């Protein structure tokens, strides 16, 4: 799994002109799922998202996680994170999981994050979405679950 995490002051996602998810202070998490991903990958990344200390403390140092910052999380599926542009000009998405397989793991990831006290909003899986956000900092972090095996 691959996540792009952005610290935001506000964000919302629309599908066909209707807002389906919105947050104020918090994290926007774009989620890409590959063919080889498992529940272990989702567990690892859910823990990372919830524990990531990228919010400022009283001294301005990045020392608080999203719960400590009284923030929320907006999770959005994005298979294009597995776009491979090494050959030609059109990305190949061969590494991305098939929609049914990806939906199961995406829902598991969302449900795992929702077990925390942090409010969670989502986009709509496999929909064309309009995502608007105000990146605070800016702070943008990319985390891949395969990193857990590199320790």
Curated annotation (Swiss-Prot):
The keyword Transport does not apply. GO terms for molecular function: D-tyrosyl-tRNA(Tyr) deacylase activity; Gly-tRNA(Ala) deacylase activity; Ser(Gly)-tRNA(Ala) hydrolase activity; tRNA binding. It comes from the Bacteria. One of its GO terms (biological process) is D-amino acid catabolic process. It is found in: Cytoplasm. GO terms for cellular component: cytoplasm. Keywords: Cytoplasm, Hydrolase, RNA-binding, tRNA-binding. Belongs to the DTD family. A Gly-cisPro motif from one monomer fits into the active site of the other monomer to allow specific chiral rejection of L-amino acids. This is D-aminoacyl-tRNA deacylase. It comes from Solibacter usitatus (strain Ellin6076). The gene is dtd.
